[in-house]
From Swiss-Prot:
Positions bearing Phosphoserine: 564, 600
Gene (UniProt): Kcnc2
First-listed, main subcellular location of the protein, grouped into a coarse class: membrane
Protein name (database record): Voltage-gated potassium channel KCNC2
Cellular location(s): Cell membrane; Membrane; Perikaryon; Cell projection, Axon
Species of the source: Rattus norvegicus (Rat)
Length: 638
């Protein structure tokens, strides 16, 4: 019995942390990575994430020496960033306890929650782990994210809201240094495609591609350079001057009254006509501001990477509408016809659009952008507040109308002598003023019943307004903290990653460290493996690498394999599958209590030919070179 129990035990070494459990525990979630691992033989074949079948690894010709205790555990197969997995002991088990040990190069802290899900049937999200990391680990272990318990779902979803908010507050990713880095990154950030060779013999296209992102950042991004900051301060100065001029034009000290009476020939009487004209000094100041706004608008539209998006922008529309009336007014001021005067009167009314230039400050102040995004994100809360107020206004306006009529005098049936609430629509105004705690005092109840209704209306208004306000404040705090964090992020520089050598290259297996490349097991040399590993890591991390060597052909992209005649005798069992095929639940692997609502289990349990659909964290990765296969005495199971 002890031997059978030891054979049923499995030791999972995840990132150096060992976890011990039973195979039956791992089989409680069929179709997941650990369930398929527990159901298959250790000597079974391995399937990659793309479904390619790997040849199993034969044991070495001679027993290799064990690594020292402080040396890292040799890695297993490395497929597209899926993680490393190794099985200790070959056919047998070299663990003193008798159980088999498998190594996964994954996050050990998250795996504790994953293993607890196999044991209890409840998947909880750790509060001290970043959301994308936990999401990636769930995808690796083959667990559906919808299995997360409701108590942890908000914690799990927080990272997605944060990522969406961070995408809103864009900051420049360029720094000084290599000029090529700025040009390439600036072109990508502005949406300008990198089209080498478009520049003609005279190089006009090349100069335009260099000038366009710089000029656009100069007028659009005040944090890109010192010159951009100077432009931003100048724009801010003219905005404030224009708004100040607009306000001073309404003051009587800057208004000049002129007599426009025209004598009529053979007329018996004359009608005096007066017009109010603005002080010419304010007109000149406004003209200087309009010239600056016109210059800024033309430069931005010329160097805009996307003209259509520029025209559709609300702030740009406000700029155009605020600039156009000034030129029309100057052009029509010399005309004396009645139609021209009517148009001038209309243009003077339209000039109030200039006050909307204050919204241009959102380009320069993060706090204003945060406020705008907060109002946009709190639309549901504002709608809820309006509904609550509308219900309260309707209820209390009706109550105050009938409450005031209760105390009416017998000789005043309409109650118009002792109260101002003559009808319910008039009570709407009183209810709004009372619920918002303004209390103008123009309308107030005069009977004891009306006073009671007024007190209830004031209390209900305080509670109604106070309920959605904390949600709006929390949204503002979240957006503001994320905006500040986005601004303090270190600026990125484009890194140069050397290309991986081709198999046909004379330097394919050479290393500067003079490492030995003589392998009796048809292994690749360590120098080549290190170089390929660096290249694979750079590609997986999202860095771009350029090279003059042609891409690999499809056969060359296949992982490096070991050839052995023993492969024919291996059983065709899998270690990990992304498609279940004709997989069915094991006869002895019943569903435990607590797993009935598991979507990971319901997607495949008892079904044949259905696919295990996992939401990938990243897009499928096609390696431009053979992936790393290290020399290890431990046979790979993944």
């Amino acid at each position: 019995m002890g031997k059978i129990e030891n054979n049923e035990r499995v030791i999972l070494n995840v990132g150096g942390t060992r976890h011990e459990t039973y195979r039956s525990t791992l089989k409680t979630l069929p179709g997941t990575r650990l369930a398929l691992l527990a159901s298959s033989e250790p000597q079974g074949d391995c399937l990659t994430a793309a479904g390619d079948k790997l040849q199993p690894l034969p044991p070495p010709l001679s027993p290799p020496p064990r690594p020292p205790p402080l040396s890292p555990v040799p890695s297993g197969c490395f497929e597209g960033g899926a993680g490393n997995c190794s099985s200790h002991g070959g056919n047998g088990s070299d663990h003193p306890g008798g159980g088999r040990e498998f190594f996964f190069d994954r996050h050990p802290g998250v795996f504790a929650y994953v293993l607890n899900y196999y044991r209890t049937g409840k998947l909880h999200c750790p509060a001290d782990v970043c959301g994308p990391l936990f999401e990636e680990e769930l995808a690796f272990w083959g667990i559906d994210e919808t299995d997360v318990e409701p108590c942890c779902w908000m914690t799990y979803r927080q990272h997605r809201d944060a990522e969406e908010a961070l995408d809103i507050f864009e900051t420049p990713d360029l720094i000084g240094g290599d000029p090529g880095d700025d040009e390439d990154l600036g072109g990508k950030r502005l949406g300008i495609e990198d089209a080498a060779g478009l520049g003609g013999p005279d190089g006009k296209s090349g100069r335009w591609r260099k000038l366009q992102p710089r000029m656009w950042a100069l007028f659009e991004d005040p944090y890109s350079s010192r010159a951009a900051r100077f432009i931003a301060f100048a724009s801010l100065f003219f905005i404030l001057v224009s708004i100040t001029t607009f306000c001073l034009e309404t003051h009587e000290a800057f208004n000049i009254v002129k007599n426009k009476t025209e004598p009529v020939i053979n007329g018996t009487s004359a009608v005096l006509q007066y017009e109010i004209e603005t002080d010419p000094a304010l007109t000149y100041v406004e003209g200087v501001c309009v010239v600056w706004f016109t210059f800024e608008f033309l430069v931005r539209i010329v160097f805009s990477p996307n003209k259509l998006e520029f025209i559709k922008n609300l702030l740009n529309i406000i700029d155009f509408v605020a600039i156009l009336p000034f030129y029309l007014e100057v052009g029509l001021s010399g005309l004396s016809s009645k139609a021209a005067k009517d148009v001038l009167g209309f243009l003077r009314v339209v000039r109030f659009v200039r006050i909307l230039r204050i919204f241009k400050l959102t380009r320069h102040f993060v706090g204003l952008r945060v406020l705008g995004h907060t109002l946009r994100a709190s639309t549901n809360e504002f709608l809820l507040l309006i509904i609550f107020l509308a219900l309260g206004v309707l209820i209390f306006a009706t109550m105050i109308y009938y409450a005031e009529r209760v105390g009416a005098q017998p000789n005043d049936p309409s109650a118009s002598e002792h109260t101002q609430f003559k009808n319910i629509p008039i009570g709407f105004w009183w209810a709004v003023v009372t619920m918002t705690t303004l209390g103008y005092g123009d309308m107030y109840p005069q009977t004891w019943s009306g006073m009671l209704v007024g007190a209830l209306c004031a209390l209900a208004g305080v509670l109604t307004i106070a309920m959605p306000v904390p949600v709006i404040v929390n949204n503002f705090g979240m957006y503001y903290s994320l905006a500040m964090a986005k601004q303090k992020l270190p600026r990125k520089r484009k890194k140069h990653i050397p290309p991986a050598p081709l198999a046909s290259s004379p330097t394919f297996c050479k290393t500067e460290l003079n490492m030995a490349c003589n392998s009796t097991q048809s292994d690749t040399c360590l120098g080549k493996e290190n170089r390929l590993l660096e290249h694979n890591r750079s590609v997986l991390s999202g860095d771009d690498s350029t090279g003059s060597e042609p891409p690999l052909s499809p056969p060359e992209r296949l992982p490096i394999r070991r050839s052995s005649t023993r492969d024919k005798n291996r059983r065709g069992e899998t270690c990990f599958l992304l498609t279940t095929g004709d997989y069915t639940c094991a006869s002895d692997g019943g569903i435990r209590k607590g797993y009935e609502k598991s979507r990971s289990l319901n997607n495949i349990a008892g079904l044949a030919g259905n696919a295990l659909r996992l939401s990938p964290v990243t897009s499928p990765y096609n390696s431009p070179c053979p992936l790393r296969r290290s020399r290890s005495p431990i046979p790979s199971i993944l």
